[in-house]
Amino acid sequence: MKVYCLLLVLLVGLVSQAQGQLDKKCQTMCTMEYLPVCGSDGTTYPNKCTLTSTACVNQMDITVLHNGEC
């Protein structure tokens, strides 16, 4: 029983560490500057940083179609 508990704790730790590494590579701190861009997913983002951050965190390939709202 102790072995199973130890394995469970190790597994949870590994999953948490992997999630933390994913979050660290994504830039999530963006300015509040409003320079809207239209994303390839049809969404208007407040600025390019927000688009890039959203794409990274959600592991999606979103690009800027054009400056301004969609």
Curated annotation (Swiss-Prot):
Please state where this protein is localized: Secreted
Listed GO CC annotations: extracellular region
Task: Tell me the ranges covered by the Kazal-like domain, including all copies.
Answer: 21-70
Which residues does the UniProt site feature Reactive bond point to? 32-33
Q: Which GO terms describe its molecular function?
A: ion channel regulator activity; serine-type endopeptidase inhibitor activity; toxin activity
Q: Which domain of life is it from?
A: Eukaryota
Pfam assignment, any one: Kazal_1
Keyword entries, A-Z: Disulfide bond, Ion channel impairing toxin, Neurotoxin, Protease inhibitor, Secreted, Serine protease inhibitor, Signal, Toxin
Q: Which InterPro entries match?
A: Kazal_dom, Kazal_dom_sf, Prot_inh_Kazal-m, Prot_Inhib_GrowthFact_Antg
Q: Is Disulfide bond given among the entry's keywords?
A: yes
PROSITE patterns, per database record: KAZAL_2
Q: Where is the signal peptide, in residue numbers?
A: 1-20
What processes does the entry annotate via GO biological process terms?
Answer: cell differentiation
Disulfide pattern: 26-56, 30-49, 38-70
The tissues in which it is expressed are:
Expressed by the venom duct.
Please tell me where this protein is predominantly located: secreted
Q: Which family does it belong to?
A: Belongs to the conopeptide P-like superfamily.
Role of this protein: Acts as a neurotoxin by inhibiting an ion channel. May also act as a serine protease inhibitor, since it possess the kazal serine protease inhibitor signature.
Domain text from the record?
A: The cysteine framework is IX (C-C-C-C-C-C).
What is the protein name for this chain? Turripeptide Ici9.2
